[in-house]
Amino acid sequence: MITFLDKENNPLSQKSYDSAVLCLQFHQLTCSCGHSGCLNVHGYYKRKVKSPSGSFLLKVCRVMCSECGKTHAILPSSIVPYSQIPLICCHQIISDLICGNKVVSVCDNYPDVDENNVKSVIRRYIRHWKEKLLSEHISLSPTDSLIRQCFSHYSMQFLQIHRTTNRLFVNTT
């Protein structure tokens, strides 16, 4: 999978995703096999994303490497891989937990996020990420820095739990 750094306060929608993917410099993307300039659009798949206005299906672009044949999803950094809950919502849950605030308050802003989703995010953080962040002195804020440091140290998006290869792409234009 390849994650591109998107604007921090840009609400995710199909239109914003499509626009961001169109602006990507595909010739600069690197496959997990190490080759650059070899990724071509292979297809799309749909995944559910929970947003403040409700859940929606996001059509995610997949690319295939012409060198090794592997396929990769192209995801914005506002998405946590293998989760329907966006990063900004997860970040709010964890921040509330750390500050001792009522963590279910996030459900007020995200109507499709229920208490079980909140518990799942907290469990994922405690089991897989809390010690990682502490050991590398990674702060939760700003989010952009959190994302970059998680990729730098662990080659994963914050709160990603599957060890699937994930590369961060920072568009230079």
Give residue spans per PLM region.
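Long C-terminal interaction/binding lobes of large macromolecular proteins
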Residues: M1-L12, F26, L134-T173
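Arginine residue identity/basic-tract feature
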Residues: R47, R62, R123-R127, R148, ...
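Intrinsically disordered, low-complexity regions enriched in small/polar residues
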Residues: D6, S19, Q28, K46-R47, ...
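Short, positively charged, Gly/Tyr-enriched micro-motifs
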Residues: G69-L159
